Swiss-Prot record:
It is a multi-pass membrane protein. InterPro entries: YciB. The gene is yciB. This is Inner membrane-spanning protein YciB. It comes from Dechloromonas aromatica (strain RCB). Belongs to the YciB family. Pfam families: IspA (PF04279). The keyword Oxidoreductase does not apply. Its main location: membrane.
Length: 202
């Protein structure tokens, strides 16, 4: 359930785009009703409408977490800021390039924060999260942390490659299924590599 909740804005973005893609004219009409303007290029209506929805969904997600748990994770705030800024630029300039950059910036913010924590603060964020569940040698914790940094850097670059070398609908598919699929494969791979340490501990 938590995974679905975390993916809630992305799922709505995907669903809105796919629905609006079938009738750009209707999407443009909804844009006029919601924001008071119709896109200059009707072909952009699906991605612009999906951008409006993902901004609203992310705001709703923050509000729900705040009232349900009282505390909102910092990275969720970062995601909100990025989607509002890049989504707002997308709508203001009617240019989908801005919203396509958003996932990359988010991935690289994750990587940058982990680099800062590891090399400046001398703290391992992965160990801080999983240290109570796993007992690993320090060099292994370091490798796990570096692997996550590398993964986020790679995902950011891959998002740009897909976003600007393939049609928008391909990028929208990748944003949900590609990103989630690669994350799942990576996490499973990490689990397999770390399982031997869990067995040794037993």
């Amino acid at each position: 359930m938590k995974l679905l909740f975390d993916l809630f804005p992305v799922i709505l973005f995907f669903a809105t785009f796919k629905y609006a893609e079938k009738s750009p004219e209707l999407a443009a009409s909804w844009m006029g009703s919601l924001l008071g303007f119709v896109p200059d290029d009707i072909k952009l209506a699906p991605i612009l409408l999906a951008t409006v929805v993902v901004i609203a969904a992310t705001v709703a997600q923050i509000i729900w977490v705040h009232f349900r748990h009282g505390k909102v994770d910092k990275m969720l705030w970062v995601s909100l800021v990025l989607v509002v800024v890049f989504g707002g630029l997308t709508l203001a300039f009617q240019n989908e390039a801005f919203i396509k950059w958003k996932p990359t910036i988010l991935y690289w913010v994750f990587a940058g924060s982990m680099i800062f924590s590891a090399f400046i603060l001398k703290k391992n964020p992965i160990k801080a999260m999983l240290g109570e569940q796993l007992t690993l040698p320090e060099p292994v914790w370091g490798k796990v942390n570096l692997s996550w940094i590398g993964f986020f850097l790679f995902m950011g670059a891959l998002n740009l490659f897909v976003a600007f070398n393939f049609p928008t609908d391909t990028w929208v598919n990748f944003k949900l299924f590609g990103g989630m699929g690669l994350m799942l494969v990576f996490v499973l791979g990490q689990g397999m590599l770390l399982s031997k340490y869990v067995e040794e501990e037993k």
